[in-house]
A protein has these predicted regions:
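C-terminal nucleotide
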Residues: 1-20, 24-26, 34-149, 153-195, ...
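Residue-level detector of functionally special positions within alpha-helical transmembrane segments
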Residues: 200-202, 256, 524
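DPxDG-like acidic metal-binding loop motif
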Residues: 198-223
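Active-site pocket scaffolds in enzymes
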Residues: 528
C-alpha cells in the first residue's frame, strides 16, 4: 500500500524564574530580571499527506488533535472549519471566518483547556491573514483524515515528582531520584490536578504550541534548518502573549512568555492596551453544537484583524521606561542593548547570569495562591499610592543594581576570562560573610589616567583583578539582600506573605553559611512554593548538585527547619541571540571599549541556542518515546 508523505515540526520553549521585579514588573516604569531555565516545553506537530489519488471532495472540517503523554485523559480533539463572513472586510471582499470547535467526546473526557484551544484558534486566524484563507484551506486539505496531530510534553522539572516517585507525605525527592526518572515522566493524574513548580508551564506550553502550529501551517518559514528571523520571533511572541492573556482572562505582566521567546533578559512590560481590543472580542472555543447560529454570527461580527495588532513593528509593543506618572527607571543593561542593536523590532535587553554563576531552584512542599497575593498588593498600592511609590522606587533601585552588577561581571569576564575564572574559583571556597574582610586585604591598584572621552567608562573599573571581581560579587550579594528586604517590607505593608519568615530565615542561613553562595530570594510574586539560590561554580573544585544540596540540607537541619525542600534539576539558561545581534558592537570603533563589547557579544552568542528553539526529534532525549506513547 502506498505511503503518504509525512511532515513534522518541533519547537521548544524554556521556563522562567523572575529573579527580581515581582509586582513592580506590572508597571512599565520598572524592569524585571528574568532568567530562563534549562527545563523546556516541547511541541511536536505531524501531518501526513495521503498518497496521490483522484481529487477528493472538499472537507467540511479539518481535525486537530493535541495530546500530552504525561497526564490522564489528556487528548483534546478539535475541528477547524470556515464560516461565511456576514460583514465585508476592509477591502470589501468577504473573507470567511476560521473557527475551531472541540468535539463532544473530547469535551466530556478531557474537559476544556483554554490554553490549548485559544492558542490554536488565534494561530489559525493569524495564518489565514498571513497566507490567505484559500491557501490555508489547501494546506489543511492535504493533511488527510488524521489531520494535524500535536504532542505537547514538558521536562520533568515543571511538575513536582513526589507522587511520581511514590514518596511518603512530607518527604522530598533527592537529586539522584529525580535524575533516575525517564524524560517526560507520566504524572498519574489529570492536568488540572498536577502540582506545578512555578517555572511558567502555561506560558512555555502556549508559546511552544503557537510557534509549532504557525510553523506547521507554513505561515512562518524558518530562514534555515534551525533558526527564525527576528521579525518572526517577535510575531510569535506577540501571538503567544495574546493567546496566554486570553486563556488567563486578563492582560498579565507577560515576562513568562517573553522569556519563552527571548530567554534570559531584563524585561519591561509592553503597553497593555495593545491587546485590549482583541480580548474584548471574547474569542472562545465551543463544543460542537453548543453555540447557536445567531450567537456565532454575533460573536464573529465583533472580530478584528489580528495582524495589525500583532505586527512586530506595532509601536505599542515597544516597552517604554516611562510609567503613566512619568517615572522612569532605566538601566545600563538596556542602554547597552539599544546602542548595540541593528533592529527596530521591539525585544528585551538580553541579560544572563555571568560565567561562574548559576541558579539553584528549591521546590517547597507548600503552595501559594499567586492571584490572591497579587490582588492584595495591588489593592494596597491603590490605597496607599505615596507609600507604594516610595517603596517601589527603593526596590527598583536594588533591582537595577543587581542587573547592572551582573552586567559588570560579564564585562570583567569578557576582559580576561582566565583571570576572572581564577578569582571566582578562589571566592567560591569562602562564605559570602567572609568576603568583606577578604576585600580589605587585597591591594587596590590605582587606575591609569584616562582621557576625558573615556570618563564614563572609567566609572566602572574593568581591570580584572581579585579586588575588582570580588567587589562586583559583593555588590551582587548586597543587591540581593536589599531586594529581599524591600520585598519583605512590601509584604508586611500589604499583609501578604511575599517572603514567609520560615523561608526567609532559611535563605539567609544558606546564603551566610554555604561557601560560594552569593544570595537568594523567593521568585516572582513570592509565597511558600519555591526559592532560588545564586551560587559560584568553581572550575577547580566543582560541586555537583547532590553535593550542594547536601550542604543546604545540613544548614536546614541545624536551623531545625520544618520545611520540606526538594531540588529541581533545572539550571539557568541564557539569552537568545538573533540575526540582528551580529556584526555590530554598538560602540565607536575608535573607543578602547570596542574590543571589549565585541568579546561580550561573542560570549553571549557562544554555546547552545537559548529561548525559543527549533528542534529535531533525535536530538531530544526521550521525545520520540513520549510521542509514541500518544499514538
Amino acid at each position: 500500500m502506498a505511503q503518504g508523505k509525512a511532515r513534522e515540526t518541533i519547537v521548544s520553549a524554556p521556563g522562567k524564574v523572575l529573579v527580581a521585579g515581582g509586582y513592580l514588573v506590572l508597571d512599565p516604569a520598572y524592569p524585571g530580571l528574568v532568567v530562563s531555565t534549562s527545563s523546556r516545553f516541547y511541541c511536536h506537530a505531524r501531518s501526513e499527506t495521503p498518497p496521490s489519488s483522484p481529487k477528493s471532495p472538499r472537507a467540511s472540517a479539518y481535525t486537530i488533535i493535541v495530546r500530552s503523554p504525561q497526564f490522564v485523559d489528556a487528548v483534546w480533539v478539535y475541528q477547524a472549519s470556515t464560516v461565511p463572513a456576514t460583514t465585508p472586510s476592509k477591502d470589501n471582499e468577504p473573507k470567511p471566518n476560521w473557527i475551531i470547535e472541540q468535539t463532544a467526546e473530547s469535551r466530556e473526557k478531557a474537559g476544556r483547556n483554554p490554553f490549548v484551544s485559544l492558542a490554536l484558534a488565534y494561530t489559525l486566524r493569524l495564518a489565514a491573514e498571513l497566507n490567505g484563507s484559500d491557501e490555508l484551506e489547501a494546506l489543511l486539505q492535504q493533511t488527510g483524515p488524521k489531520g494535524i496531530e500535536i504532542t505537547v510534553a514538558a521536562d520533568n522539572d515543571f511538575y513536582s515528582q513526589r507522587e511520581t516517585l511514590n514518596l511518603p507525605e512530607g518527604t522530598a525527592p533527592t537529586v539522584d531520584q529525580l535524575s533516575s526518572l525517564p524524560p517526560f515522566s507520566p504524572q498519574k493524574c489529570r492536568i488540572s490536578d498536577v502540582h506545578k513548580t512555578g517555572l511558567g508551564s502555561s506560558a512555555a506550553m502556549t508559546t511552544s504550541l503557537v510557534a509549532c502550529f504557525l510553523l506547521h501551517l507554513q505561515a512562518v518559514v524558518p530562514k534555515g534548518p534551525d533558526s527564525l528571523e527576528t521579525e518572526d520571533l517577535a510575531l510569535i511572541h506577540n501571538l503567544a502573549q495574546l493567546a496566554h492573556c486570553a486563556a488567563q482572562g486578563k492582560i498579565g505582566s507577560g515576562f513568562d512568555v517573553s522569556a519563552a521567546i527571548w530567554g534570559s533578559q531584563l524585561y519591561r512590560r509592553f503597553e497593555p492596551k495593545v491587546l485590549q481590543a482583541c480580548l474584548d472580542e471574547g474569542e472562545k472555543v465551543f463544543t460542537e453544537g453548543e453555540e447557536t447560529k445567531q450567537e456565532r454570527e454575533a460573536r464573529l461580527s465583533a472580530r478584528i484583524e489580528l495582524l495589525p495588532v500583532l505586527d512586530p513593528y506595532n509601536p505599542l509593543w515597544e516597552a517604554s521606561s516611562l510609567s503613566a506618572s512619568g517615572e522612569s527607571q532605566s538601566t545600563a543593561t538596556e542602554g547597552l542593548a539599544v546602542s548595540s542593536s541593528n533592529h527596530q523590532v521591539p525585544k528585551p535587553a538580553p541579560l544572563q547570569l555571568p560565567p561562574g554563576l548559576d541558579l539553584l531552584l528549591a521546590d517547597v512542599d507548600a503552595g501559594s495562591n499567586t492571584p490572591s497575593l497579587v490582588s492584595k498588593v495591588l489593592a494596597w498600592r491603590k490605597d496607599k499610592p505615596a507609600w507604594a511609590k516610595q517603596l517601589y522606587n527603593v526596590i527598583a533601585a536594588s533591582n537595577q543594581g543587581l542587573a547592572d552588577n551582573l552586567l559588570r561581571l560579564r564585562l570583567l569576564h569578557a576582559s580576561d576570562a582566565s583571570a576572572y575564572q581564577q578569582f571566582v574559583d578562589s571566592t567560591a571556597t569562602q562564605r559570602s560573610t567572609e568576603w568583606d574582610a577578604l576585600l580589605k586585604t587585597l591591594p587596590q591598584e590605582a587606575k591609569d589616567d584616562q582621557s576625558s572621552a573615556d570618563a564614563d567608562a572609567s566609572d566602572l573599573d574593568l581591570r580584572v583583578t581579585h579586588h575588582t571581581v570580588l567587589q562586583a560579587l559583593i555588590d551582587v550579594r548586597n543587591s540581593l539582600r536589599s531586594i529581599r528586604a524591600g520585598m519583605r517590607e512590601l509584604g508586611q505593608r500589604a499583609g501578604v506573605p511575599i517572603e514567609p519568615p520560615e523561608i526567609g530565615s532559611l535563605i539567609k542561613k544558606i546564603s551566610d553559611e554555604v561557601p560560594g553562595v552569593v544570595g537568594g530570594s523567593i521568585p516572582g510574586a513570592g509565597g511558600f512554593d519555591a526559592f532560588y539560590i545564586i551560587y559560584l561554580k568553581s572550575s577547580q573544585s566543582p560541586r555537583d548538585l547532590s553535593q550542594l544540596w547536601a550542604q543546604i540540607h545540613a544548614v536546614k537541619e541545624e536551623a531545625e527547619s520544618k520545611l520540606t525542600l526538594g531540588p529541581l534539576l533545572s539550571r539557568a539558561g541564557g539569552a537568545k541571540t538573533t540575526s540582528d545581534d551580529e556584526g555590530n558592537d554598538g560602540v565607536d570603533h575608535s573607543s578602547p571599549l570596542s574590543d571589549l563589547f565585541k568579546k561580550l557579544k561573542a560570549s553571549e552568542q557562544a554555546g547552545q541556542d537559548f529561548g525559543l528553539r527549533l528542534e529535531q526529534t533525535k536530538s531530544v532525549k526521550g521525545l520520540k518515546e513520549a510521542i509514541a506513547r500518544c499514538a
